[in-house]
Amino acid sequence: MSFTAPSDPVNKPTKVKVSQLCELCHSRKALIRRPKNLSKLCKQCFCLVFETEIHNTIVANNLFQRGEKVAVGASGGKDSTVLAHMLKLLNDRYDYGIEIVLLSIDEGIIGYRDDSLATVKRNQQQYGLPLEIFSFKDLYDWTMDEIVSVAGIRNSCTYCGVFRRQSLDRGAAKLGISHVVTGHNADDMAETVLMNILRGDVARLEKSTAIITQSSGSPIKRSKPFKYSYQKEIVLYAHYMKLDYFSTECTYAPEAFRGTAREYMKNLEAVRPSCIIDIIQSGENLALKAKKSNAGKRVVKFVDGNRCARCGYLSSNNICKACMLLEGLEKSRAQVAIENDTSADGAALKLRALEKLSF
């Protein structure tokens, strides 16, 4: 009669099914299934693969030149925090020979940007990188909170987008930097493609899908090393690497059109995980058909034609978009002052002042 010893639940080795093992190392348990190719990886292999993919994107697109000074658009959010960490890591690992500077813009949103900038300042200490901060108030004499009080919340992203893009360029120029790197990821780019299609604005597809953009005559170029990186994987990488980032959504973001596109993208991704890259590639193909070029592959330069007659910033029109928005804000502020003045004499004086406003 045979006797079988009782199993020891403590010392009994745990058998992991082959299907649950990491497809790269075949030894550790897989913890993630990547949406872009459905590969199953462990924590360590995922981080290594993610870093290697970013490096390959940088090399394949020749993003950096040795000796170049590069500004990382740092907001304190997950994308820019991972980007700053990644560039510092890869620059040390592969010897790109670049100088990295954190460049932040303070839009003036109390309870949001002031907290996120505190995160950026911690990142500065953690990564040992220099930090420069420029504010809307200093550059335009307006904060986003002031803009919203005059223009309304529904238009907030229009103002913020235009002023922020120009602020990054102005900040970089003041620092003598000709290359700004941003944390735009695959989800962001797919959303932009979708928004342009919904607007019927096919002409913008080339710029929205290019990994490097630069206006003709401008010394500032921009690049997006995370073009092919899914937002989910960026968040997961930040979690695994225990990175310090700010995760609160902008106070004014829920009213943005992009939020609608984002929700639609999430629904699509639930059905077809590869839809994000598919949409980017579709945008590239549509841009190629609309204009014979190599959109998304090399540097895409855009002809602006001249400089703004008011501020000197590059513009396709006589007056740049930022100055046009500022003109509207100043007129609105003057009109609000008139409406709030209960005295007839005061209102009349302000009305005459409004009529004389020139920009």
UniProtKB/Swiss-Prot annotation:
Keyword RNA-binding among UniProt keywords: yes
Any single GO CC term annotated in Swiss-Prot or TrEMBL for this entry: peroxisome
| EC code | 2.7.7.-
Signal peptide segment: none
Do you know which CDD domains this protein is assigned to?
Answer: CTU1-like
| InterPro entries hit by this protein | CTU1-like_ATP-bd, CTU1_C, Ncs6/Tuc1/Ctu1, Rossmann-like_a/b/a_fold, TilS/TtcA_N, tRNA_thiolation_TtcA_Ctu1, UPF0021_CS
Q: Which SUPFAM superfamilies match?
A: Adenine nucleotide alpha hydrolases-like
Q: What class of enzyme is it?
A: transferase
Q: Which pathway is this protein assigned to? A: tRNA modification; 5-methoxycarbonylmethyl-2-thiouridine-tRNA biosynthesis
Q: What does this protein do?
A: Plays a central role in 2-thiolation of mcm(5)S(2)U at tRNA wobble positions of tRNA(Lys), tRNA(Glu) and tRNA(Gln). Directly binds tRNAs and probably acts by catalyzing adenylation of tRNAs, an intermediate required for 2-thiolation. It is unclear whether it acts as a sulfurtransferase that transfers sulfur from thiocarboxylated URM1 onto the uridine of tRNAs at wobble position. Prior mcm(5) tRNA modification by the elongator complex is required for 2-thiolation. May also be involved in protein urmylation. May also be involved in protein urmylation and in invasive and pseudohyphal growth.
Subunit and partners: Interacts with NCS2 and URM1. May act by forming a heterodimer with NCS2. Component of a large molecular weight complex of more than 250 kDa.
Q: Which protein, by its recorded name, is this? A: Cytoplasmic tRNA 2-thiolation protein 1
Tell me which species this is from: Saccharomyces cerevisiae (strain ATCC 204508 / S288c)
**In the record, what lineage is assigned to the organism producing the protein?**
Eukaryota, Fungi, Dikarya, Ascomycota, Saccharomycotina
By which gene is this protein encoded? NCS6
